[in-house]
Design a protein with these regions (language model features):
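RNA-binding accessory domains that recognize and position tRNA/RNA substrates
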Residues: 1-168
């Protein structure tokens, strides 16, 4: 499991034939904003940018918030697409979140899944249901489901790798 920063960008996809120009400009601006972090890698894949190989997450996120065209930034975990591995990682991320809350607090949650890789054996709804069930089994006294206004929103994206995060 590797820490990454997931970057979503705006309406570049609507620009038609100019799209490559705008994507290159955004990539250049992202790299320029991170020039004081020489070991950082910026990767573009499937409509997202990913920042890898970093140490100072807060400073990098702060630098990225100043880049025009970025819609949202999420600290995330990148891992393989094996469902058991994914479930264990979601449990671990949830445990970290719960450890930051008072022990007697019941936290409402929701699992949201997006499956860009349509060859993945489970659809988005099944991924959300199974991971949600696993979390309820793991933390029955700490979690309750609330799909409308949850305290914790566990996000799962299945792409070339699996990505999990809870901050958007």
């Amino acid at each position: 499991m590797e820490r990454v920063i997931l970057i979503r960008y705006g309406e570049i996809h609507l620009k038609g034939q100019n799209r490559p120009f705008f994507e290159k400009a955004l990539h250049k601006n992202i790299k320029n904003s991170l020039r004081s972090f020489p070991d950082v890698k910026v990767i573009r894949a499937q409509g997202r940018y990913y920042v890898e190989n970093y140490e100072d997450e807060a400073s990098i996120i702060d630098a990225l918030t100043r880049v025009f065209g970025i819609v949202s930034i999420s600290p995330a975990y990148k891992l393989g697409k094996d469902f058991d591995l994914l479930g264990a990682a979601v449990e671990q991320m949830t445990a970290t979140y719960l450890a930051q809350r008072p022990a007697d607090t019941i936290v409402s949650f929701k699992v949201e899944s997006r499956r860009a890789d349509k060859t993945y054996p489970l659809n988005s709804m099944d991924i959300s249901k199974k991971l949600g069930s696993r979390l309820l089994s793991a933390y029955p006294d700490r979690l309750k489901v609330d799909v409308h206004d949850p305290d914790l929103r566990v996000n799962v994206e299945i792409r070339e790798h699996a990505y999990i995060y809870h901050q958007v």
